């Protein structure tokens, strides 16, 4: 199953260039339900609300502290780690 996430252009470009290998979501009940109610194998990133997308294989989804330079806040977040583009 594929998880679809909308990204701002800046973060989309970083992933596209291979500079970012994690995406972050708030540690809130909404994201807990959304991320763990299905067994996701892939993540599809959308550049803002356009039709431009790219899909990657998910390595893991966990809770922790992300990298500030990749847009993570200073508190615990859901970390979606991904590997190669499909």
Residue ranges and their predicted role:
Residues 1-86:
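Catalytic phosphate/metal-binding cores of nucleic-acid and nucleotide-processing enzymes, i.e., regions
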């Amino acid at each position: 199953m594929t998880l679809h996430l909308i990204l701002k252009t800046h973060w989309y470009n970083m992933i596209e260039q291979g500079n970012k290998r994690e995406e972050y979501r708030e540690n809130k009940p909404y994201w807990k339900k959304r991320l763990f109610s299905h067994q996701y194998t892939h993540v599809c990133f959308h550049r803002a609300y356009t039709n431009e997308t790219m899909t990657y294989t998910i390595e893991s989804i966990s809770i922790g502290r992300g990298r500030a330079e990749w847009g993570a806040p200073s508190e615990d977040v859901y970390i979606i780690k991904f590997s190669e583009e499909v």
